């Protein structure tokens, strides 16, 4: 019955409001960046839109481990599992710190969103090009030096089945090379809202678990510590999930 009520609300009210807010938010970001308010634009319009989007989709968020959130002036490479497109709203709306996303190159071409991300100077990476990876490292360094943290999904893409996929090494190389700690975060429940290859969202509660920061230096010497840190991070992030399942580490 609750799902029926949700769809009776969603199509005439929730979905139109979501699309309108998308256009308003991305347009605001683009204009504000053009006028020189890039730091404000890269954070606050997306924060408000993310909170609104979760509310419009009847998907409340419970936060565990808020005491691990960075204090003012601290920068991190923030890593999280990638359950669905709603992960963006969860992190943007509930992890309140200055940051830049590291995004797949394909997202640059999304209507409205791609242009807004470009204007906000988010970092696009194409794993197939060595030059793109090198550019990502340089942009990451500039981002951290400017006082912004970096958000990365180390799986590289959304999960196909709800399990945590094997982590790629890019986030951990970046953390090591730039000498910043990693902040692991677990998202649980977003997969139930919108699994990959589906387009009709379902309301569901989300739990956001913020873990204690870790460092690549905790796991030995370079380069062996990169693979070890990736495996240990995957274990940390997977632990709070309800079925506690992961793909092969």
Predicted regions and their residues:
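Non-catalytic C-terminal accessory region of glycerolipid acyltransferases
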Residues: 4, 134-249
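Catalytic core of membrane glycerolipid acyltransferases/transacylases, capturing the structured
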Residues: 22-47, 55-58, 71-130
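Short gly/ser/thr-rich secondary-structure transition/capping motifs
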Residues: 57-64, 133-134, 190-192
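A short beta-turn/loop motif at secondary-structure boundaries
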Residues: 67-71, 200-201
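Membrane-interfacial terminal anchoring regions of lipid-handling membrane enzymes
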Residues: 1-33, 44, 69, 227-249
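Glycine-rich phosphate-binding loop signature in dinucleotide/nucleotide-binding domains
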Residues: 70-73, 144-146
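Generic preference for hydrophobic
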Residues: 63, 78, 101-102, 208-210
